[in-house]
């Protein structure tokens, strides 16, 4: 059993394909017996993925900054709530407690979380050991959402600006994503 962080938007996109992917991922994480950790909002894709995991009988941990209104916290249907002082502390806490990470479609906050993991992997912050593998950071590329970013990262590697194993993986289907988590 792993502890898996899911990074995604607190907004609900108009496209049902992203909502469906979040719902399916939440269910699958629960079905695999993993614990889902997320940023604590009950809104948008965050709310969808956490509700799906809980409804499937999974364990869900919300890491919520104190700047969130109390009604957001009280309305959470999760296994555990961890309160932190800031968005930065939320990110640090999630990264420290998880074995693997999945990025669903999201905005700037999602990219910030994704790249925080990638940088930590490159610096071997998790292990302090260059021989120890990186924690997987999986970009769930729903309907090509991350294809432009993946192309940019490929270019950075070809140009010698991105080095070593940063743990960044991509998957275009739920099945691929779950296999990478195993």
Segments (PLM) and residue ranges:
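Active-site/ligand-binding-proximal alpha/beta "capping" segment
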Residues: 89-126, 138
